[in-house]
């Protein structure tokens, strides 16, 4: 169990500092195997971008090939946004066994199965929480279906390999959605929120809470009420909650809930609560199918106007006594199940009407050590996908306290693979953070026909190697076709084993074909002489 107090300390938390120090020994051994001699281990960070299931699979391919080439052992930090967090977290739940991890991935997409009943049970359980939000629904009923996984382990379970230094230190990114206006206006660093096996919090403020107490209630820096540590399924939903078209999805949630009034349930009466649950969630899970407006919900069977159903359901369900609600069913167990289901429907409808995501207790509430009143006056935080700010977690590895020398940025975007570089350049310029400066015209030129690797260097700060997934070296002239095949909002049901294997192979090839370039930059940051290709601050490699 972690500390029950809030920590406000500039710099690295002591647990991370110790883990990184232990990791240095493993990095030095790995460099020696790669024939790179160094007195000090350089700090290398690997970043995985967002991109839904495409990013999940491609990131696994990258990690697998880096392990195969002996490169992963030379990495100090692994950081991810959205879909990449699903892959990175899997690395730790499998104790770093990439062969087993890859085999498991292929198996999941061979059988095309998903445990609806278990996901239903987890969602109903989550709906009993005072902080239930659409993130819970998204995590247990959408992301679990996309990944074919429902992990019940926790971030704190990852401590052992991290503290022993056998695996890189992982950082999972989110942003505080309530601070989006500050981000839009000034790219405020405190917008970014991070999760590690030890802590969760705002790195820009140096304000953290033990990961085991993330979600618990604090006041004035003290623990008031303990809540169980959230499982990885929920966190994956939080980290991967960026949506393509919020208005379309909001309307679809409403459309589905309108069909689930008491009237609708009684008319479609099913033999038991379990089958009712299947009926409800089979309809709710069409949320993704209509996220692009391709499959509009059907009219109600009775021909009644759909636009009044949600309001009617919420009002009637609130007013009707529990006894009357359950009158048609005499089985006590069935009564309880039905009540829980309808409570879930009601709560989901309310969250959808408010579009409420990522609700959790604010551990900085009434904290005297925080001068920013916005941070300390809120009872709740609303944490969402960091890809809504920058689709790669550069802001979490750039602080000087982490002393990163080399960044390997793997971009799994379906669109412009340099948008993350543009956004990070702007962020760093505003806050005087060392980062290679690239001219907009050059980025525009690169984006028209991306190569597989770009090396960006500035006078100070880390060297950045940027690897677009879809590039002319691997895809030839078919980049657009590849992008269409692996669309961000493509359902997992369309991912056959062949489609998965092809994407894994593409991601691996990008690492393998650029191994020499990576080794060269490792030599450079390790302090060894190696001839430079160019004196330019940014060069294509």
UniProtKB/Swiss-Prot annotation:
Catalytic center residues: 82, 385
Cellular component GO terms held in the UniProt record: cell cortex; cytosol; endoplasmic reticulum membrane; lipid droplet; membrane; mitochondrial membrane; nuclear envelope; nucleoplasm
Keywords: Cell membrane, Endoplasmic reticulum, Host-virus interaction, Hydrolase, Lipid droplet, Lipid metabolism, Lipoprotein, Membrane, Methylation, Mitochondrion, Phospholipid metabolism, Phosphoprotein, Prenylation, Transferase
Listed result of changing residue 402 to A: Abolishes enzyme activity. Reduces lipid droplet formation
Residue ranges, annotated region (Required for lipid droplet localization): 260-292
Modes of activity regulation: Not regulated by calcium, coenzyme A or ATP. Lysophospholipase activity is inhibited by palmitoyl-CoA. Lysophospholipase and O-acyltransferase activities are inhibited by methylarachidonoylfluorophosphonate. Lysophospholipase activity is inhibited by phosphatidate or lysophosphatidate. O-acyltransferase activity is up-regulated at low concentration (10-20 uM) of phosphatidate or lysophosphatidate, but inhibited at higher concentrations.
GO biological process: arachidonate metabolic process; glycerophospholipid catabolic process; inflammatory response; intracellular signal transduction; lipid droplet formation; parturition; phosphatidylcholine acyl-chain remodeling; phosphatidylethanolamine acyl-chain remodeling
UniProt EC number: 3.1.1.4, 3.1.1.5, 2.3.1.-
Reported impact of residue 538 to S: Has no effect on membrane localization. Decreases the affinity for 1-O-hexadecyl-sn-glycero-3-phosphocholine acyl acceptor in transacylation reaction
Residues recorded as bearing Cysteine methyl ester in the entry: 538
Induction (record text): (Microbial infection) Up-regulated by HCV. (Microbial infection) Transcriptionally up-regulated by HTLV-1 Tax.
Protein's UniProt keywords contain Phosphoprotein: yes
Chain residues in the propeptide: 539-541
Modified residues (Phosphoserine): 337
Record-annotated PLA2c domain positions: 1-541
Official protein name in the record: Cytosolic phospholipase A2 gamma
Taxonomic path: Eukaryota, Metazoa, Chordata, Craniata, Vertebrata
